[in-house]
Amino acid sequence: MSDHADTLLGKDTTYPEHYDPALLQPIPRERSRETMVRGDLPFTGVDIWTAYELSWLDSSGKPHVAVGEFWVPADSSAIIESKSLKYYLNSLNQHRFATREQARQAIAGDLSEAAGGEVQVTLFDIDDYSNVGTLPGTCVDTLDAPVYVYQPDASLLKFVDQPGEQQQLFSHLLKSNCPVTGQPDWATVWVQCSGLTLVPESFLAYVVSFRGHQDFHENCVERIFTDLMAGGKLQDLAVYARYTRRGGLDINPLRFSGAQDPEALEQLVSKRIARQ
């Protein structure tokens, strides 16, 4: 099913009782990129993880909880295998930190070491994280495509030579599958592009084509990005997916080309969707 036999996925493991950064398992990004990208990366971006089950003890032994947000840069050398991150976070449950900031710094240092890049960590109070929203643009899910297939097929993407305003399209129908366990991964995928006009029905068909595909969230988004870039003479492109949570974690990869409006990107990633 995959060559990720060295990960925790699909294996019975014992939950840790003590803080252990060694639980984190990196997976080199180059494993997937070598088949998609030649030369310099055509994108930049970030993988935004949300940790809903995060707790530790203070110096008196009192438990604290938070929602954690981890920003892993797309140019880091590795992604972090999700089950290993879950077990790492559970290893914090009985560990004592003198302050909340000490806990944040420890998590940031451990994740940065595992990812091979500087990971930004923010800890939110539970009552400050009720930010459910919607994505901007047009949902294509009410349209009908001429054909549906269930393995990724870039030839499904169609463009028309009618340059116009910047497009924003999204679909709630993205489904991919874990490359180790085969478990389904559900997501909403959003694209923003300028240059040639992307035919919305073709984007719908392309999104559906991932339904039988097995790969990690980050790799799926990068494939969508490279297929869109290859299919049309686009001036700018951004691809963003918000995956539903599993094991108390969700992963939300964002990839974009060129210069993007920082304020617009901040507004885009600041909201989670209802399924999360």
Curated annotation (Swiss-Prot):
<dbReference type="InterPro" id="IPR050084">
    <property type="entry name" value="NADPH_dep_7-cyano-7-deazaG_red"/>
</dbReference>
<dbReference type="InterPro" id="IPR043133">
    <property type="entry name" value="GTP-CH-I_C/QueF"/>
</dbReference>
<dbReference type="GO" id="GO:0006400">
    <property type="term" value="P:tRNA modification"/>
</dbReference>
<dbReference type="InterPro" id="IPR029500">
    <property type="entry name" value="QueF"/>
</dbReference>
<dbReference type="InterPro" id="IPR016428">
    <property type="entry name" value="QueF_type2"/>
</dbReference>
<feature type="binding site">
    <location>
        <begin position="246"/>
        <end position="247"/>
    </location>
    <ligand>
        <name>NADPH</name>
    </ligand>
</feature>
<keyword id="KW-0671">Queuosine biosynthesis</keyword>
<comment type="subunit">
    <text>Homodimer.</text>
</comment>
<feature type="binding site">
    <location>
        <begin position="217"/>
        <end position="218"/>
    </location>
    <ligand>
        <name>substrate</name>
    </ligand>
</feature>
<feature type="active site" description="Proton donor">
    <location>
        <position position="185"/>
    </location>
</feature>
<feature type="binding site">
    <location>
        <begin position="82"/>
        <end position="83"/>
    </location>
    <ligand>
        <name>NADPH</name>
    </ligand>
</feature>
<comment type="function">
    <text>Catalyzes the NADPH-dependent reduction of 7-cyano-7-deazaguanine (preQ0) to 7-aminomethyl-7-deazaguanine (preQ1).</text>
</comment>
<dbReference type="GO" id="GO:0033739">
    <property type="term" value="F:preQ1 synthase activity"/>
</dbReference>
<feature type="binding site">
    <location>
        <begin position="80"/>
        <end position="82"/>
    </location>
    <ligand>
        <name>substrate</name>
    </ligand>
</feature>
<comment type="pathway">
    <text>tRNA modification; tRNA-queuosine biosynthesis.</text>
</comment>
<dbReference type="GO" id="GO:0008616">
    <property type="term" value="P:queuosine biosynthetic process"/>
</dbReference>
<keyword id="KW-0560">Oxidoreductase</keyword>
<dbReference type="Pfam" id="PF14489">
    <property type="entry name" value="QueF"/>
</dbReference>
<protein>
    <recommendedName>
        <fullName>NADPH-dependent 7-cyano-7-deazaguanine reductase</fullName>
        <ecNumber>1.7.1.13</ecNumber>
    </recommendedName>
</protein>
<dbReference type="GO" id="GO:0005737">
    <property type="term" value="C:cytoplasm"/>
</dbReference>
<comment type="similarity">
    <text>Belongs to the GTP cyclohydrolase I family. QueF type 2 subfamily.</text>
</comment>
<feature type="active site" description="Thioimide intermediate">
    <location>
        <position position="178"/>
    </location>
</feature>
<dbReference type="Pfam" id="PF14819">
    <property type="entry name" value="QueF_N"/>
</dbReference>
<keyword id="KW-0521">NADP</keyword>
<dbReference type="InterPro" id="IPR029139">
    <property type="entry name" value="QueF_N"/>
</dbReference>
<keyword id="KW-0963">Cytoplasm</keyword>
